[in-house]
Design a protein with these regions (language model features):
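Conserved acetyl-CoA binding element of GNAT-fold acetyltransferases
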Residues: 20-35, 82, 177-188
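Acyl-donor-binding surface of acyltransferase catalytic domains
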Residues: 32-101, 105-109, 241-246
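A short beta-loop-alpha structural element at the N-terminal edge
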Residues: 102-118, 122-125
Length: 249
């Protein structure tokens, strides 16, 4: 973790600071919800002054004054992201007549195929990046992010399969009685063919059968397909935040 402290009595943490290996550094920034705009401006100025950082992502509550400050500093809006939550008692299972599809937890032998799926479906256009952050480069960054959880005891990856073919995956981190969905993807050719709905529903059912009581997930407001899948299973939107990104010129 890399931490910056401004002149004001507030601390800014970057939990996912990563110097990626394609000539660019990425800092994902999250500020305290009740921080004053002037505090945030000072903290951001300190971060953007770090010559090791070429890209900075701001995540936080939407605030007109703060957004104007960020725009003046060169940040551009990416998307609104929703936090969704599902309690076990509200879960609605999705069913389909295609019994050839099944959901099961991944083994070590499946991980390379999971990486291949992540590479194949990455859509960099939602990130509004320049040439330094191409689709291939950002795809590899996402693969490394998926891989960083593998091997940890609270990491669980569920797959949807047809026979031996892996068609998609969804990854969770368990925290006591809560499971957090951190990533998921379906092979591009099978999107809009009910595969995603069955995978998510099957994974949620398996998780709740372990004693987990709540599942949380984050979805971009632009990803209408994913929102519909979550809401069909009973998820409710409980929070929203905006993501803006700055790129060093």
């Amino acid at each position: 973790m890399k931490t910056y402290v401004s002149e004001f009595p507030m601390e800014v943490s970057i939990p996912n600071y990563e110097k990626v290996n394609f000539g660019c550094a990425v800092a994902e920034l999250r500020l305290r919800p009740k921080a004053e705009v002037d505090d945030e401006w000072m903290a951001l100025s300190s971060i953007l002054g770090d010559k090791d950082i070429d890209v900075c992502t701001f995540k936080g509550r939407e605030d007109t004054r703060l957004v104007q400050v960020l725009n003046d500093m060169g940040f551009k809006f990416i998307s609104t992201f929703y936090t969704l939550s599902l309690d076990r008692t509200d879960f609605m299972e999705t069913t389909h007549e295609n019994i050839a599809l099944r959901v099961e937890e991944a083994t070590d032998a499946d991980i390379e195929r999971v990486y291949d799926i992540e590479r194949g479906v990455f859509d960099y256009s939602t990130y509004q990046m320049d040439d330094r952050l191409s689709a291939d480069k950002m795809s590899e960054r996402n693969v490394r992010r998926v891989a960083s959880y593998v091997g940890k005891p609270n990491n669980h990856i569920f797959l949807i399969k047809r026979d031996s073919a892996i068609l998609g995956f969804i990854q969770f981190l368990y925290d006591d009685d809560i499971a957090h969905a951190v990533n998921g993807a379906i092979v591009r050719s099978l999107q809009d063919q009910f595969v995603g709905s069955l995978m998510y529903s099957g994974a949620f059912k398996s998780i709740f059968n372990t004693g987990i009581t709540t599942i949380t997930s984050g979805v971009s407001a632009q990803n209408i397909r994913a929102l519909r899948i979550h809401q069909a299973c009973g998820f409710k939107i409980i929070d929203a935040e905006i993501h803006l990104r700055w790129i060093r010129k």
